[in-house]
A protein has these predicted regions:
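Bacterial N-terminal signal peptides that target proteins for export
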Residues: 2-20
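A short macromolecule-binding patch
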Residues: 238-248, 314-334, 415-432
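Intrinsically disordered, low-complexity segments enriched in Gly and acidic/Ser/Thr residues
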Residues: 306, 394-434
Length: 468
């Protein structure tokens, strides 16, 4: 549909970056065919064949507050050898559907596998059925459909040389891919300039960040277990990730051992090992195979009923057709212990707190949450009966003001979705020793922050995990 948006809206949309860190599920380099998603009988880490390197595909996006949903499917992916020859195909999961705004300011694992060592001069992508939704100044959702299919070849300059375990990052600038006529948005058109491709080796386990191997708040259903390893089907992305464990791995909330994980919906925290394989430091149970979880943005609250726009989910009744749909969630009767904070890495304990509260009285429209339920997810627009409500990290962007040693304010743009939804114009940000800061924060400058967003009854308070 066509939609009139302001220049300010376009500048906000331009900040949206759709990122694939190509943890390449390279169908064993030279040519496995077929779609992904099948689980091997033995989910243990696959030995790296001679002449190949363990690599990882991740996805994410940079915060863009005006955008409340961006969905896309990856139909094909390959790398072109610099010396010539056929492109090396990357096997992507069948029927994958990726929603990116929930990963604002963060890279998330997509798939893992083995990539042939060598030098590559281009990446080739086919993206299908892209969709973008943002809020107008009056709070009306504006939906833009992209092309049914878009194939793009992105030159790599300089060439990409793969010689050891690696994380490949592909940033897709959605703002640069929007077409307009007379100030009216009329479509999405991906071009080579939409993409920036970089690469990093896995970082030291204790200090990893999202772009060099960190595993933070990765959710899915365990589809196979073997010995000390398990395989996780991640959300609606459809990808399968295999994790190793050992005696240091912590099991929580109803899961006690690897053997107890089968068919469970879980959250995993961990890191990428030096050889490129994945290790689980913590595994937390969410629901049994009769339940589900749905992640999304609270767009409205009426009494005790939340309206949630779904970003992702897993479990009974959840499928890719429900990504982007709205659901109602009635929190009446939930005890204080049912409201939790999904802190992940870098926040420590002690949340929620008096300064950073999260309960039935301080939950607020504009926050990202995860709804855990013991029942199946209903059809779109249906009512989800919650068992637990978990606060999740989200991205916020704007202009810096009142900078101090460990605090600053973000002034939200007039068309910011958070501002429109909540009616608030400022977010107060607190940093700590674990905040991953990649840019200089100065009054008057633009900033993109990912963290936990709390409502204290009068104002927004955010603890920053990342500043970009």
């Amino acid at each position: 549909m066509n939609a009139q948006i302001s220049r300010n809206s376009l500048s906000q949309v331009a900040k949206l970056t759709f990122t694939f860190a190509l943890v390449a599920l390279i169908a064993l380099a030279a040519g496995c065919g077929g779609g992904g998603g099948a689980v091997a009988n033995n989910p243990g880490p696959t030995p790296t064949p001679a002449g190949t390197t363990s690599t990882q595909v991740r996805f994410g996006d940079a915060p863009a507050d005006s955008v409340i949903a961006f969905e896309v499917s990856v139909s094909s992916l390959s790398l072109t050898p610099a010396a010539g020859g056929a492109p090396i195909a990357v096997t992507v999961p069948a029927n994958n559907r990726i929603e990116l705004t929930h990963a604002s300011g963060k890279f998330e694992p997509f798939v893992t596998g083995n990539l042939p060592q060598g030098t590559f001069s281009a990446a080739n992508l086919t993206l299908v059925n892209s969709e973008l939704t943002f809020l107008s100044g009056t709070g009306t959702p504006v939906h833009i459909n992209g092309p049914a299919s878009a194939s793009i070849t992105v030159p790599l300059s300089p060439n990409l040389t793969i010689s050891g375990p690696l994380v490949l990052n592909i940033d897709v600038n959605v703002g640069a891919s929007i077409t307009t006529a007379g100030g009216v948005v009329n479509g999405i058109a991906f071009t080579p300039t939409s993409f920036t491709i970089t690469a990093k080796a896995p970082g030291a386990a204790a200090n990893q960040q999202d772009d060099d191997g960190e595993i933070e708040d990765v959710q899915g259903t365990v589809t196979a277990v073997s010995g000390s390893s398990f395989t996780l089907k991640v959300g609606q992305a459809g990808s399968s990730l295999t994790f190793a464990t050992d005696g240091t791995t912590q099991f929580k909330d109803g899961v006690t051992t690897v053997a107890s994980l089968l068919n469970q919906v879980v959250t995993v925290e961990g890191f990428t090992q030096a050889d490129g394989s994945l290790f689980a430091k913590e595994v937390e149970g969410l629901e049994s195979n009769t339940g589900a979880e749905v992640e999304g943005l609270i767009t409205a609250i009426s009494g005790t009923t939340l309206t949630v726009n779904a970003h992702d989910g897993i479990g009974s009744g959840m499928d890719d057709t429900k990504v982007g749909a709205s659901f109602s969630v009635n929190i009446a009767g939930l005890s204080a212990s049912k409201f939790r904070v999904k802190a992940g890495n870098g926040f420590g304990g002690g949340l929620p707190s008096a300064t950073f509260p999260f309960d039935a009285t301080t939950i607020h429209q504009g926050q990202r949450i995860e709804v855990d339920t013991n029942a199946a997810v209903p059809p779109a627009s249906g009512a989800i009966t919650p068992d637990k409500i978990n606060l999740q990290q989200q991205g916020v962007s704007g202009t810096v003001a009142n900078k101090a040693a460990s605090t600053f304010d973000i002034n939200l743009a007039t068309d910011s979705a958070l501002r429109i939804i909540s009616g608030q114009t400022v977010v107060h940000v607190t940093t700590n020793s674990s905040t991953d800061t990649r840019v200089s924060v100065a009054n008057g400058g633009s900033v993109q922050v990912r963290g936990l967003l709390f409502w204290n009854g009068t104002s927004w308070q955010m603890i920053a995990r990342r500043i970009r």
